A protein has these predicted regions:
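A short, local hydrophobic-aromatic micro-motif
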Residues: 118, 146-147, 223, 235, ...
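Phosphate-binding site of ATP-dependent enzymes
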Residues: 183-264, 285-292
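Active-site nucleotide/adenylate-binding loops and adjacent lid/helix of ATP-dependent enzymes
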Residues: 3-7, 19, 35, 83-87, ...
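ATP-dependent carboxylate activation and anion-phosphoryl transfer catalytic cores
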Residues: 1, 7-10, 139-142, 255-293
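ATP-binding N-terminal substructure of ATP-dependent carboxylate-amine bond-forming enzymes
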Residues: 1-123, 127-129, 133, 137-140, ...
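Generic secondary-structure signature for well-ordered alpha-helical cores
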Residues: 30-33, 143, 196-200, 230, ...
């Protein structure tokens, strides 16, 4: 097959996208597919450019990519659909993280062009990227999720509604970009300002202590539950992408009931968000055995 991998992009997760593309491109070529690689900011990558950016490693902090946003917008509007590598591809494999690559923008553009692509459609991508909307849908579907408020909100309201500590984060970001665990009311304002650098909406969520579990979904079926043990208090950007900063255990050492319930809730979450193909649902397993998406 002729497969074009879309990667890079202008979000703070640009390096993460390249790291994903390393595995995808290598795996596809090993299986005999004809693979082209397109950065949604710069266009088709030559073999030399591939070697330069597809390194498989990610820095300990997300890169500043604001200067790339306008370039990506211009390329998507005028260049992507005109590329031979896009027009002649049997399918586009999306290796994009954050920003337009995950929020439904590129998916909607590809629907307009009429090119098949992997992953969820534009609506599912948009729903899953927006944490506030996702949590509202989870709540309505009976999926347990931590209580939350949306900024602006006073420290007094947070004390009354959520208690401390809380997690302050951009509503539409991934990889814990812009996230802070806030333990004192006097630190709330700074955390909200920091999160607002990455999104125009900021969520303040009750901190749920416990173990970090994750369940993959493939074609509507839950895969075995795994556990992630980070070196830090939370599974932050550094722990996600720095070798040795976290331990991943598959399958997780949990009871049969926890494994079954996490799988059940993952399938519900996948369906509620109208996702397609594959997804991943992360949980906190509390000391008393409760699960929270």
């Amino acid at each position: 097959m002729k497969i074009t991998v879309l990667t890079g992009g202008s979000s703070e997760e640009r390096d993460v996208a390249f790291a994903s593309a390393v595995q995808i491109v290598g795996g596809l070529r090993e299986r005999g597919h004809q693979v082209a690689v397109v950065d949604t900011v710069t266009g088709v990558l030559s073999p030399e450019e591939e070697r330069g950016v597809l390194k498989g490693s990610v820095g300990t902090t997300p890169p500043s990519t604001r200067e790339l946003v306008a370039r990506e917008r211009a390329f998507l509007l005028s260049g992507l659909g005109a590329l031979r590598e896009v027009q002649e591809a049997d399918v586009l494999f999306l290796a994009l993280h954050g920003g337009r690559g995950e929020d439904g923008t590129i998916q909607a553009l590809l629907d307009t062009i009429g090119v098949p692509y992997t992953g969820s459609r534009s609506l599912g991508s948009a729903l899953a990227m927006d944490k506030d909307v996702s949590k509202r849908l989870f709540r309505d579907a009976g999926v347990p999720t931590a209580p939350w408020l949306m900024a602006p909100v006073s420290a007094g309201d947070v004390t009354k509604e959520l208690g401390w500590p809380v997690v302050v984060k951009p509503s539409k970001q991934g990889s814990t970009v812009g996230l802070t665990v806030v333990k004192r009311p006097e630190d709330l304002e700074a955390a909200v300002w920091y999160a607002s650098e990455f999104d125009d909406e900021v969520m303040i969520e009750q901190f749920i202590p416990g173990r970090e579990l994750t369940v993959g979904i493939l074609e509507g079926q839950a895969l075995p539950v795994g556990e992630i043990i980070p070196k830090h208090e939370i599974f932050d950007y550094e722990c996600k992408y720095t070798q040795g900063m976290s331990e991943e255990i598959f399958p997780a050492d949990v009871s049969e009931s926890v494994a079954a319930e996490s799988g059940r809730l993952s399938v519900i979450s996948h369906r509620v968000l109208k996702l397609g193909g594959y997804s991943r649902v992360d949980f906190r397993l509390t000391p008393n055995g409760g699960l929270s998406v």
